[in-house]
């Protein structure tokens, strides 16, 4: 399956995220739909997994929007803005990003992104 197919079918296609992307550990976008990272955001996202204190204190930027970080560790970063938010999950080679709005429960978005990340980790990605 291509990276774009994972974004289209396993993330956005579930209806539990409205936008998604997969980026490499270098911050470059591998695939995306309804989500566009601005210059430098990918690298800052990847760095947030190494330096959780920076994203906990300064928030996380995705698609030009700042999100209040509500969880950050070396595997997951969750951000909130109003009733929407973002779920970022690191795998061995990539970072999955899911964006949800007020019509989607945060837990639904989190489950979809975390499950795909688990699958990719189990398969060496």
Curated annotation (Swiss-Prot):
InterPro entries: PFN (IPR048278), PFN_euk (IPR005455), PFN_sf (IPR036140), Profilin_CS (IPR027310). It comes from the Eukaryota. Keywords: Acetylation, Actin-binding, Cytoplasm, Cytoskeleton. Pfam families: Profilin. GO terms for molecular function: actin monomer binding. It comes from Physarum polycephalum (Slime mold). CDD domains: PROF. SUPFAM superfamilies: Profilin (actin-binding protein). Occurs in many kinds of cells as a complex with monomeric actin in a 1:1 ratio. It is found in: Cytoplasm, Cytoskeleton. The modification N-acetylserine is found at residue 2. The gene is PROA. The keyword Cytoplasm applies. One of its GO terms (cellular component) is cell cortex. Binds to actin and affects the structure of the cytoskeleton. At high concentrations, profilin prevents the polymerization of actin, whereas it enhances it at low concentrations. By binding to PIP2, it inhibits the formation of IP3 and DG. The keyword Amino-acid biosynthesis does not apply. This is Profilin-A. Belongs to the profilin family. PANTHER family: PROFILIN.
């Amino acid at each position: 399956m291509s990276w774009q197919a994972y974004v289209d079918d396993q993330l956005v296609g579930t209806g539990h995220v409205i936008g998604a992307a997969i980026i490499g550990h270098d911050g470059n976008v591998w695939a995306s739909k309804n989500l566009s990272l601005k210059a430098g955001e990918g690298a800052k996202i990847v760095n947030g997994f190494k330096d959780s204190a920076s994203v906990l204190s300064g928030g996380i930027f995705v698609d030009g929007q700042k999100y209040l970080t509500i969880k950050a560790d070396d595997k997951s970063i969750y951000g909130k803005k109003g009733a929407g938010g973002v779920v970022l999950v690191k795998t061995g080679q990539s970072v999955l990003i899911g964006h949800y709005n007020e019509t989607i429960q945060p837990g639904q978005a989190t489950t979809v992104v975390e499950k795909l990340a688990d699958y990719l980790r189990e398969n060496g990605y």
